[in-house]
Amino acid sequence: MRIFHLITHFSLGGAERVAANIAESQTPGMEYHVVEIMRGRTAYTPKFIGELEKAGVRCHRSWMPDVSFHFLFERIAALLFPLRMLYIMLRWRPDVIHTHTETPDLALYVFSRVFPHMLRRVKIVRTIHNTRLWTGLPRTAQWVEAFFKSRNANIAISDSVRDSYAERFGEVAPIINNGVAEVEQKDYFNISTPQGVHLSQVHQQHLNTSTFSSPVALSLRRAWSYSARC
């Protein structure tokens, strides 16, 4: 099974991290690709791509620059995405397309309007990461949400996300929580710290270096099996 994750850019971000964790799961029988809509250009981008490629994930870079100024640029990127996605569809024939956050959501919606028959045999999964969607874009929200609801694609990451979405868009999405990987816990209250270093700094460093991941295989199976039953 060939799974394509659509993310905004190869850079640091919660949704990008979730997509990367799923793609790095190396589940038997699954081939993972990650596609960015706008070209990441932060200091973290090379590390992010290197991590994915080391795990055997194929990365598809965008030529559209990531301009962090106004959602207008994200909309332009989404409007230009269909031709690029057409090449991906013809070249790779994905079985599943999994979108994360509004820019990829909009890009896939535009593709579905330009090439409506290309997604007929493709399973669509859409993870909702935020409690607020499409701020200031009510008409865009109406179009995009109608598309994802028609594909039974929505998966919420928490109770608050599910409830917020249900209140605004009238659909109660199933929940698949973002998981936290097990890490060895140390008793920081009974260890000595270097001179001049406060214990809180050690604790914060532990939080910063803990490995966070998603229950990847289980999440995908539950999402796809749920959608298949609907």
Q: Which residue ranges define each predicted feature?
A:
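Short His-centered aromatic/hydrophobic patch
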Residues: 81, 99-105, 128
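Short hydrophobic signal-anchor/transmembrane segments that target glycosyltransferases
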Residues: 23-29, 111-116, 199, 212, ...
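Conserved donor-binding/catalytic core segment of Leloir-type glycosyltransferases
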Residues: 4, 192-201, 205-222, 228
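A short, basic/aromatic alpha-helical/loop segment that forms part
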Residues: 12-13, 134, 182-185, 219-224
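Proline-aspartate-enriched helix->loop->beta-strand connector
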Residues: 93-95
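N-terminal strand-loop element at the rim of the active site
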Residues: 5-73
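Carbohydrate-associated surface elements
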Residues: 160, 179
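A conserved, positively charged/aromatic
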Residues: 73, 77, 89, 118-156, ...
